[in-house]
């Protein structure tokens, strides 16, 4: 098999910018290059439910150019940018067929991103980071200052969200010594506000518009727009954070303090702060505001909250995913799967029942990810779509 493109994504929702990344990457490597995507499941890295289910988003991806969509298991979907990238890139590497990793960035150039990634991997960076943190500035600012000591103004790249992920992807490639060739495509028209021009908007703006009841189909590929319209008609979406508030609060209030202290990111008393907030505040926003500290971003607290509710602990998101679950198969997906089956270093799951026989931690993580779907569907607008156990019954979508 020749070149195979790997892409890490959330597709929350799949939009024109995502289709453009696939198109631009194929323009560089060849129009018939197969594309395999590792995609977050029902909960995403910002610590929120996805607006549409993983099954709908995976179907949209293969109808819009991808050939195979694999699920990033829950512990890595709800991890920091570093953990998210490590898990997703590691999963692509474990397939044994992916030759290139393509990602969008505000920078659009590989060399500056590589220099920042190398600076972050400097063993002495931790000492400089701790020195910056002692001055009382937030973690992100302290990290940027520590990197600036090594690469100067290039550290400013860490102020843009897609640059941050791009750097983490590169770190994952270097740290795991993977034979993946990185490619980056300039993000266009994807500013994180309402004033972007053209037919591309950022996913964050589209989620905001969807939450407000607006029609966003002009910014989605036609096939994706049709899929999400179908999901809305059937009452399976959109799933908005407020729809899960009562379920999340009830879960958070039932957990002992020991669970909070075992959460990913529960350092410097954050676990204790979140435990107190969960037992004092009447709303989820109140919990987040009460637990937030000056040093850490709100997204970190949201992830901790979701990890607590879903049973993710700090022992789960180390390393890389121990299996590859197939969510959707596109035009070249069958051929790609045959090659992966011969070369992958992890089990490839096409039928969810096979997840029950995964040994040890792999089976536990598969079951945890399936349980998360049961919480997710409680946010579906239609009551009949809130049935339990759906993740165990779902087969991959086949184009």
Regions found by a protein language model. Name each.
Residues 9, 44-45, 61, 75-76, ...:
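Short, contiguous strand/loop micro-motifs
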Residues 50-54, 62, 81, 85:
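Generic structural signal for well-ordered secondary structure
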Residues 58-73:
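A glycine-rich helix N-cap at a beta->alpha junction
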Residues 1-57:
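N-terminal catalytic cores of NTP/NDP-binding nucleotidyl/phosphoryl-transfer enzymes
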Residues 26-30, 62, 92-93, 174:
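N-terminal cationic-hydrophobic initiation segments that often serve targeting/anchoring roles
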Residues 3, 33, 67, 98-99:
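Conserved acidic residues
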Residues 71-399:
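Active-site cores that bind ATP or allylic diphosphates and position pyrophosphate for catalysis
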């Amino acid at each position: 098999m020749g070149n195979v493109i790997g892409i890490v994504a959330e597709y929350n929702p799949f939009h024109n910018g995502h289709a453009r990344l696939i198109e631009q990457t194929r323009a560089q490597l060849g129009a018939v290059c197969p594309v395999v995507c590792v995609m977050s499941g029902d909960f995403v890295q910002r610590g929120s439910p996805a607006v549409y289910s993983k099954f709908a988003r995976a179907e949209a991806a293969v109808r819009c150019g991808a050939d195979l969509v694999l699920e990033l298991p829950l512990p890595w979907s709800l991890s920091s940018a570093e953990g998210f990238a490590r898990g997703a890139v590691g999963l692509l590497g474990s397939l044994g067929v992916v030759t290139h990793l393509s990602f969008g960035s505000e920078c659009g150039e590989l060399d500056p991103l590589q220099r920042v990634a190398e600076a972050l991997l400097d063993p002495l960076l931790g000492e400089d980071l701790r020195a910056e943190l002692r001055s009382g500035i937030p973690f992100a600012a302290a990290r940027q200052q520590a990197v600036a000591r090594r690469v100067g103004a290039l550290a400013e790249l860490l102020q843009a969200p897609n640059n941050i992920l791009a750097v983490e992807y590169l770190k994952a490639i270097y740290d795991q010594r993977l034979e993946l060739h990185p490619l980056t495509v300039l993000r266009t028209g994807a500013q994180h506000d309402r004033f972007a021009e053209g037919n591309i908007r950022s996913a964050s703006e589209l989620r905001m518009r969807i939450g407000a009841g607006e029609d966003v189909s002009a910014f989605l590929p036609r096939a994706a727009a049709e899929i999400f319209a179908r999901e809305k008609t059937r009452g399976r979406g959109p799933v908005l954070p407020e729809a899960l508030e009562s379920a999340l609060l009830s879960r958070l209030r039932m957990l002992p303090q020991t669970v909070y202290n075992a959460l990913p990111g529960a350092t410097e008393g954050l676990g204790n702060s979140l435990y107190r907030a969960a037992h004092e505040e009447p709303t989820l926003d109140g919990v987040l505001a009460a637990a937030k500290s000056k040093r850490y971003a709100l997204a970190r607290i949201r992830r901790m909250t979701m990890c607590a509710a879903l049973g993710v602990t700090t022992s789960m998101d180390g390393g890389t995913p121990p299996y590859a679950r197939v969510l959707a198969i596109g035009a070249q997906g069958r051929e790609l799967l045959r090659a992966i089956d011969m070369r992958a270093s992890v089990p490839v799951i096409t039928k969810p029942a096979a997840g029950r026989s995964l040994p040890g931690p792999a089976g536990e993580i598969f079951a945890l990810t399936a349980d998360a779907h049961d919480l997710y569907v409680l946010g579906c607008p239609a009551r009949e779509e809130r049935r339990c156990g759906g993740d165990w019954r779902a087969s991959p979508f086949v184009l």
